[in-house]
Amino acid sequence: MTDTPTKQEITSKNDKVPGAIPGEQKKNNRNNDRKRNRRGDSKNLERDSDWQERVVQIRRVSKTVKGGKKMSFRAIVVVGNEKGQVGVGVGKAGDVIGAVRKGVSDGKKNLVRVPLTPNNSIPTLSKGRDGAANVLIRPAAPGTGVIAGGSIRTVLELAGIKNVLAKRLGSKTPLNNARAAMVALSQLRTHKSASRERGISLEQLYS
């Protein structure tokens, strides 16, 4: 007469952990997954909290289609972490919130890393141009502040620059000025990198 295996013996053979009940093991696995997801979400929130967003302009725009005019919103957004990274983005959507959200996403895709000096200024003078807008930025002494206006000021502040002089020439369009400022910031080089590119020492660079 053969012995019939008990329920406990069957479950112990099927489970990875001997003697464990399948339902309890699945429940423990789900709890562990939730804990890992929470830890991952908290890290993402910490990274996102370092970034700031400022809306430079929101305009209502229209597009002529076959059935008439299609209205939408365009948002110009500047994103930065005030630690040397900044970006300008443009978003279009049927509502303002959607346009701003797309602008933030576009700005984070076009980030520029800015070399900052110990007194939160820029190392050298720089120029940038976008369309008919020209922007000139130059370093300033500690305590000067951000001497700039419009969208240029927003870009410089979110980049983490606290002492700088900026001058706008040509077009007054917020988007062109913001992009011209981005071009000027992207051309900045530290003193060491400038001397390395030119193949001379720091003493020869300033002699």
From Swiss-Prot:
Gene3D superfamilies in alphabetical order: 3.30.160.20, 3.30.230.10
Annotated TM spans: none
Keywords, alphabetical: Ribonucleoprotein, Ribosomal protein, RNA-binding, rRNA-binding
GO molecular function, one term: structural constituent of ribosome
Family membership: Belongs to the universal ribosomal protein uS5 family.
Disulfide links within the chain: none
Xref: InterPro entries: Ribosomal_Su5_D2-typ_SF, Ribosomal_uS5, Ribosomal_uS5_bac-type, Ribosomal_uS5_C, Ribosomal_uS5_N, Ribosomal_uS5_N_CS, Ribsml_uS5_D2-typ_fold_subgr
GO biological process: one example: translation
S5 DRBM domain span: 51-114
A Pfam family assignment: Ribosomal_S5_C
Functional description taken from the UniProt entry: With S4 and S12 plays an important role in translational accuracy.
Protein name in the entry: Small ribosomal subunit protein uS5
Gene Ontology cellular component annotations, sorted alphabetically: small ribosomal subunit
Domain of life of the native organism: Bacteria
Subunit structure: Part of the 30S ribosomal subunit. Contacts proteins S4 and S8.
Comment on protein domains: The N-terminal domain interacts with the head of the 30S subunit; the C-terminal domain interacts with the body and contacts protein S4. The interaction surface between S4 and S5 is involved in control of translational fidelity.
UniProt keyword annotation of Electron transport present: no
Residue ranges of the region described as Disordered: 1-51
Compositional bias ranges of the Basic and acidic residues kind: 24-51
Organism: Prochlorococcus marinus (strain MIT 9312)
Keyword Ribonucleoprotein: yes
